From Swiss-Prot:
Location in the cell: Cytoplasm
Region (Involved in Mg(2+) ion dislocation from EF-Tu): 76-79
UniProt cross-references to PROSITE patterns, sorted A to Z: EF_TS_1, EF_TS_2
Keywords: Cytoplasm, Elongation factor, Protein biosynthesis
Superkingdom field: Bacteria
Function: Associates with the EF-Tu.GDP complex and induces the exchange of GDP to GTP. It remains bound to the aminoacyl-tRNA.EF-Tu.GTP complex up to the GTP hydrolysis stage on the ribosome.
Name used for this protein in its record: Elongation factor Ts
Entry annotated with the keyword Protein biosynthesis: yes
Gene3D superfamilies: 1.10.286.20, DNA helicase RuvA subunit, C-terminal domain, Elongation factor Ts, dimerisation domain
InterPro entries: EF-Ts_dimer_sf, Transl_elong_EFTs/EF1B, Transl_elong_EFTs/EF1B_dimer, Transl_elong_Ts_CS, UBA-like_sf
UniProt family annotation: Belongs to the EF-Ts family.
Cited PANTHER family: ELONGATION FACTOR TS, ELONGATION FACTOR TS, MITOCHONDRIAL
Gene assigned in the entry: tsf
Cellular component annotations (GO), alphabetically ordered: cytoplasm
Length: 269
C-alpha cells in the first residue's frame, strides 16, 4: 500500500491523503486511482474557471513543411515559469501538430498517446498546479511545395509567430518571423485592409487637415500621403524591415511572398 502511495504521489503530484483516498475508492487499482485523481483534478480546476488567466506561454513546433503553435494561459507569471506548466505547453504544441488543426475545440478533444484528451490533460494540470489554465489559441500550417515554414518565440515565451513563405529561403522565413514578432503587422497585403477601417481613417485625416486650416485643394494630397503611411505601419510587405530599415520587408524578400503569418501574444487577441 505504501509503495503504491509513493508511486502515485510521484506520478500525479497529489497529496498523500488524496492518493490514499483514491486508492481506497479504486480498490487499490493504481490505474483507476490515477484516473480518479485526474477526475478530481478536473473538478478543482472547474472551481477555478472563474478566475482570469492572462499570463502563460506560447510554443511552436516545426516538422518539415508543417508547423503548429499554441497559447496556453495561466493566472500568474510564476506558474508560467513553472517547469510542469512549460512541459504541458510543449505537450499541447506537439499534439497540435499531430492533430493538424486551427480549431481550439478540435485540439481540446484530440486524444494523446496516453488515452486522455488534450482538454483533460490541461484540466488535470490545473488541478495539480492550483491555477486556472486555459488553452486559448492554436494555429497550424501545412505548407506546399516550394514553401518554407518558420517559427519564432520571444525569449520570455510571451510572443510567438509562424510564417509560411513561398519562394526565398528558410533564413528569410525566419527573419520575417522575427520581424512580425517585433513590428506587429496587421495585414498580409493591402487587399486585406478592411474598407470601412480605411474609409474611417481617411475621414479622420481629412477632418484633421481641415481643422488645421489646410486649404481644401491640397487636403486630398495630404491625406493620400498619410494613407500611404497608414499602409507602411500596418501592411507586412510595406513595413520597414526590422533588421535593415533602409528596405521594406517586400524589398528584402524580392520575388518571395509571405502566404500567411500568425502572431500570438499572451493576453492579447
Amino acid at each position: 500500500m505504501m509503495e503504491s502511495i509513493k508511486k502515485l504521489r510521484e506520478l500525479t503530484g497529489a497529496g498523500m491523503m488524496d492518493v490514499k483516498k483514491a486508492l481506497a475508492d479504486a480498490g487499490n487499482d493504481e490505474e483507476k486511482a490515477i484516473a480518479l485523481l485526474r477526475e478530481r483534478g478536473i473538478v478543482k480546476a472547474a472551481k477555478k474557471a472563474d478566475r482570469e488567466a492572462k499570463e502563460g506561454l506560447v510554443r511552436f513546433v516545426v516538422d518539415g513543411n508543417r508547423a503548429a503553435m499554441v497559447e496556453v494561459n495561466s493566472e500568474t507569471d510564476f506558474v508560467a515559469r513553472n517547469s510542469d506548466f512549460q512541459a504541458l505547453v510543449e505537450q499541447v504544441a506537439q499534439a497540435a501538430l499531430r492533430a493538424g488543426t486551427n480549431n481550439v475545440e478540435e485540439l481540446r478533444n484530440f486524444t494523446l498517446d496516453n488515452g486522455e484528451t488534450v482538454g483533460n490533460a490541461v484540466a488535470a494540470a490545473a488541478g495539480k498546479i492550483g491555477e486556472n489554465l486555459v488553452l486559448n489559441r492554436v494555429a497550424y500550417i501545412d505548407a506546399g511545395e516550394g514553401e518554407h515554414v518558420a517559427g519564432y518565440v520571444h525569449s520570455n515565451g510571451k510572443i510567438g509567430v509562424l510564417v509560411d513563405l513561398l519562394g526565398g529561403t528558410e533564413a528569410q522565413a525566419k527573419d520575417v518571423a522575427l520581424h512580425v514578432a517585433a513590428e506587429r503587422p496587421q495585414y498580409l497585403n493591402r487587399d486585406e485592409v478592411n474598407a470601412a477601417d480605411l474609409e474611417k481613417e481617411r475621414e479622420i485625416l481629412t477632418n484633421k487637415a481641415l481643422n488645421e486650416g489646410k486649404p481644401q485643394q491640397i487636403v486630398d494630397k495630404i491625406v493620400q500621403g498619410q494613407i500611404g503611411k497608414f499602409y507602411e505601419e500596418r501592411v507586412l510587405p510595406e513595413q520597414k524591415f526590422v533588421k535593415d530599415n533602409s528596405v521594406t520587408v517586400g524589398q528584402y524578400l524580392g520575388n518571395a511572398q509571405v502566404k500567411r503569418f500568425v502572431r500570438f501574444e499572451v493576453g492579447a487577441q
